[in-house]
Amino acid sequence: MAPKLLLHGCCAHCTAYSFKYWQEQGFAVSVYWYNPNIHPFMEHQSRLEAMRKLSAEMGFELITEPSYHMAEYFKNVSANVDGRCRICFDMRLGQTAAYAAGHGYEYFSSSLFISPHQKHQDAVCSAEALAKETGVRFAYADLRKRYSDSRHITKPLDLYRQQYCGCVYSEYERFGKPNSPA
């Protein structure tokens, strides 16, 4: 029987190749959606709907966290805006590892590790610490060189494609005026 891996899905585009990769490595993969960093709420819903479509297309089990946890996210990151990415990784991967521990998964990972736009090493450090804390093994692969492969999988599916990481800070960094105050 294949070992069970819970893959945190940050978005449909990054999840597509990540799911395929871990499945090819011999894991029974389920995808977990928990992303309280994505704002505004309708952006979160658009990305979740894209993930549901991808799940139907690729045939994976999609587990969604029923609570959005927006207030908790802002409470955690507002105290340390410069360190927000690590805090965000701790929240999302922490929830994933905890779910994995409570539901019989031997491993966890994330589609974050395919994105060239994430603070990769911070995400790795977060996942490694959470593996020690929860006892669930962290399955790691640096998939950043395969990012375009994921896009090739999802482009024909005409899924919603986001323009920023998800948080309002990244949205401002992407679209805000260069000299305007934050």
Swiss-Prot record:
Enzyme Commission number: 1.17.99.6
Keywords: 4Fe-4S, Disulfide bond, Iron, Iron-sulfur, Metal-binding, Oxidoreductase, Queuosine biosynthesis, Redox-active center, tRNA processing
InterPro entries assigned: QueH
Superkingdom as given in the UniProt entry: Bacteria
Pathway: tRNA modification; tRNA-queuosine biosynthesis
UniProt enzyme class: oxidoreductase
UniProt-listed GO biological process terms: queuosine biosynthetic process; tRNA modification
GO terms for MF: 4 iron, 4 sulfur cluster binding; epoxyqueuosine reductase activity; metal ion binding
Catalytic activity from the UniProt record: epoxyqueuosine(34) in tRNA + AH2 = queuosine(34) in tRNA + A + H2O
Residues at which [4Fe-4S] cluster binds: 10-11, 85, 88
Disulfide bridge map: 165-167
PANTHER family found in the cross-reference section: EPOXYQUEUOSINE REDUCTASE QUEH
Role played: Catalyzes the conversion of epoxyqueuosine (oQ) to queuosine (Q), which is a hypermodified base found in the wobble positions of tRNA(Asp), tRNA(Asn), tRNA(His) and tRNA(Tyr).
Family classification: Belongs to the QueH family.
Protein name, per record: Epoxyqueuosine reductase QueH
Organism: Dehalococcoides mccartyi (strain ATCC BAA-2266 / KCTC 15142 / 195)
Organism lineage string: Bacteria, Bacillati, Chloroflexota, Dehalococcoidia, Dehalococcoidales
